Amino acid sequence: FNVWLFFILMAIVLLAGPTLYLLNITVNTVGLWLNNFIRMSFWTDPIQQGGFPEAWTIFYWAWWIAYAPMMGLFFARISRGRTIKQVVLGVIGFGCLGTFLFLSLAGGYVLYLEGAGLLDASGILHNQGMSKLVSAVIAQLPFPAIVLAITTIASLIFYATTFDSAAFVLASICTLGLKGDQEPKKENRLIWALALGFVAVGLALAGGFETVKSMSVISSLPVIPILVMMC
């Protein structure tokens, strides 16, 4: 259901927004990515030291490294009976495709609004934060109330499924004698979901997004040696 909501949102942005511009920037993005992938992967900015690699590249590497064990166990659990090809296409292929579509269309629309002088997106992001920017961008679309409702519902479902997946994996690990075809008790999953929620709220209240970023980097450190040994 949440996947359909995602495609509905992307269709609204594509059709109601500058369609030709969004298609052009999507194609252009692929070219830029292919052209700069190796350089950006090894870019540490030693001369200017602007802080971009640390704040974005390394942070997202650490984010996904910390995320990998939990999601790997979850995908392995729900992929029972499927071939490796199906798992790779489903997890990596369609996952990357969805991320690419969202960043190209949603990000491209924000760039269009900024470039056309319709919205001071960078100013809103700097002074008021991401949540205000999302609301301001949605307000530029037709039927903003409906689009905002769809966005809110989709976001809640995505968050809920992520928490449920994490709670499922943690509950499975903490349940002794659990066989491959068995599931942990629901109350165990509920406890872990609540614990994860409290941790997220606590980190957000303690220092905002910067604290979350720091914890992501710290959490990834123990996993890095395991990934190296697996390779």
Segments from the language model and where they lie:
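Alpha-helical transmembrane segments of multi-pass membrane proteins, especially transporters
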Residues: 2, 90-95, 189-192, 215-218
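Extracellular/periplasmic helix-loop-helix junctions in multi-pass membrane proteins
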Residues: 203-218
